């Protein structure tokens, strides 16, 4: 069984999280610059068995032509071309940034660390992945 990686795609930064090999626990991985994402993923997939990607997608937005929706759609196409052996899922990312910010407060992070957008991005990816795992297991297993 391979890992599942979640991607919280942003125009500037991309938060990444990954499961353990048994696909039980979602953990924050890192945050990379948006233009470095493909290179990072190619390197990571070469050393780790990644079975699937879960891309956070704002599912309840009426205007599908916003810059972020267009960028996420293009990124998904890029993933499909570069990783034909991995499944690619879209998963609702609504409110993940707010949940991540609240988790940092509850976790006792200092104000400086809570303002660090890299922490928010990788934690948002982890929330997306945990939500996907819960939903996936409920519907497909």
From Swiss-Prot:
Lineage: Bacteria, Pseudomonadati, Bacteroidota, Cytophagia, Cytophagales
Keyword Nuclease on entry: yes
Function (record text): Could be a nuclease involved in processing of the 5'-end of pre-16S rRNA.
Biological process, per Gene Ontology: rRNA 5'-end processing
Organism this protein belongs to: Amoebophilus asiaticus (strain 5a2)
Protein name: Putative pre-16S rRNA nuclease
Pfam families in alphabetical order: RuvX (PF03652)
Enzyme Commission code(s) on record: 3.1.-.-
GO molecular function, one term: nuclease activity
Family: Belongs to the YqgF nuclease family.
HAMAP family in the record: Nuclease_YqgF
Subcellular location: Cytoplasm
Any one of the GO CC terms: cytosol
Alphabetized PANTHER family for the sequence: POLYNUCLEOTIDYL TRANSFERASE, RIBONUCLEASE H-LIKE SUPERFAMILY PROTEIN (PTHR33317:SF4)
Entry keyword set: Cytoplasm, Hydrolase, Nuclease, Ribosome biogenesis
